[in-house]
């Protein structure tokens, strides 16, 4: 039925399936792990092939406009109603959900050192630490910025998030996401997006892992409009990859965790819920290699706005104002003439949480390191430090390529509140604001 199907890799209780992918961004995909598992010309036949159950997973209201209507039909061994046992509260650890007021919101620019990986075994669910929250998950608005620290795979466990969509940004170590839609492998330089309500587990594929995690409480991430840029560049739809179907038919006791209403709930099932044999639709997890992003920029003079580096946007109800923008600062050429080339000094209506995947960020060559983070909340000034300013103001303006660097930003319309962990863990750099103390008065009315 589908040229991307790899049935020879699928088996009962398969645990080591090689991931396969379909190209495109939120296409109407179809994929089956067994031939004939997908019904033809209908969604819900009287009897599904192989004794499967038909189930729809909706990521938008039924009446959403066609361009933003998201749903998939799943053909699975057991319907999800069989995945609901008697839930009990589980330890949510350091994962926090907005609104979270456990610490006051400081009027200051903030920067953190990378959190160290623990020496003990810690799975994904145990290793999420929240740095900031914004908005209100109950009203489906805002976001949270987390860091994950993983030293052990999830075994006989599954999880889904009812509160929001999850974007993983690996910084160290590679991960395998075993989802009910299929398998996804990803490492530093890639992102993975898991929609709200999709069951999955996280496995290590090569040593401990650390990275960033954006929890999007609002509308789903989508590609930004290009406007006058035209039909090409930025993130191209063909570079997004969605997994082909892969299932588990395992009668092994499995813990199912659900994040719902800011609380983590758990139940035990007598089988694996990762049991989708075939599916079709446009609501599915995907990954994207950030190194395929084609940046645009100034080829004459001046420094354009950072919005030109937007990879994905989660829009709000106000046109042009994002609930979240995911922005990257990748390798690129700097060629603008008679121009201060680093990001300029700025006060912004949006609130910016930044991280560094690898390399050096051109506006902050010192102190902002891979695995670390910074927060510049709305209307708090920020910009290059003294070293970056002096170098950019006096250096030779020859074409220069920034290489080996990948920084990113989660930008939201809502102020971001720091958590107790972010404020008191010892990672907060107390002298961050000192990076601007060396910026002295340069004004001389006698020298134009």
Swiss-Prot record:
Name a GO molecular-function annotation. Answer: homogentisate 1,2-dioxygenase activity
- Reaction(s) this enzyme catalyzes, per UniProt: homogentisate + O2 = 4-maleylacetoacetate + H(+)
Q: What class of enzyme is it?
A: oxidoreductase
**Can you tell me which residues bind Fe cation?**
346, 352, 382
- The reply to whether 4Fe-4S figures as a keyword in the UniProt entry is no
Pathway field of the UniProt record reads:
Amino-acid degradation; L-phenylalanine degradation; acetoacetate and fumarate from L-phenylalanine: step 4/6
Where's the active site on this chain?
Answer: 303 (proton acceptor)
Q: How does it assemble?
A: Hexamer; dimer of trimers.
Family indicated by similarity = Belongs to the homogentisate dioxygenase family.
Q: What is this protein called?
A: Homogentisate 1,2-dioxygenase
The source organism is: Rhodopseudomonas palustris (strain BisA53)
